[in-house]
């Protein structure tokens, strides 16, 4: 399966790794294809620079060491495919849809009430309960 991570999950995995998060990441790396979008990677770098100054180099090194498929979020995004409370989250799900991602893992509650077939939207806890 192709699994995309949202920014908040990436931050947790890269800056605050724990036993469960490491297990989830290892499972994804060994059994599935990790997909990261340009929007999420850019947002990750921006958040780290703003909230965790001095960690940018570490994040860049970790990203370079990770195995993932990098997909581009289009600069022009078709609106109206789904409703989401926070418009800043629209490009994340839009990219997951157009790139045919199977699962989007996010800790963002704004995704929880979206009713779409694919990708399946799961929290890290839901993902771990199902697959680990």
Where are each of the predicted segments found?
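Active-site neighborhoods of divalent-metal-dependent phosphate/nucleic-acid chemistry enzymes
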Residues: 68-104, 109
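Extended, non-globular alpha-helical segments
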Residues: 38, 42-66, 126, 130-132
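Alpha-helix capping/helix-boundary segments
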Residues: 9-10, 40, 92, 110-111, ...
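Acidic, PIN/NYN-like endoribonuclease modules and their adjacent C-terminal/linker elements
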Residues: 82, 109-132
């Amino acid at each position: 399966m192709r699994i995309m991570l949202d920014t908040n999950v990436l931050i947790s995995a890269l800056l605050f790794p724990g036993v469960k998060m490491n297990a989830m990441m290892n499972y994804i790396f060994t059994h599935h294809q990790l997909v990261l979008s340009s929007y999420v990677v850019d947002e990750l770098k921006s958040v780290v620079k703003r909230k965790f100054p001095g960690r940018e180099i570490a994040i860049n090194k970790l990203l370079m060491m990770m195995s993932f498929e990098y997909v581009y979020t289009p600069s022009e995004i078709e609106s109206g495919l789904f409703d989401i409370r926070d418009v800043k989250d629209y490009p994340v799900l839009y990219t997951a849809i157009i790139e045919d991602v199977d699962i989007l893992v996010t800790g963002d509650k704004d995704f929880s009430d979206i009713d779409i077939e694919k990708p399946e939207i799961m929290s890290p806890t839901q993902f771990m309960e199902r697959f680990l």
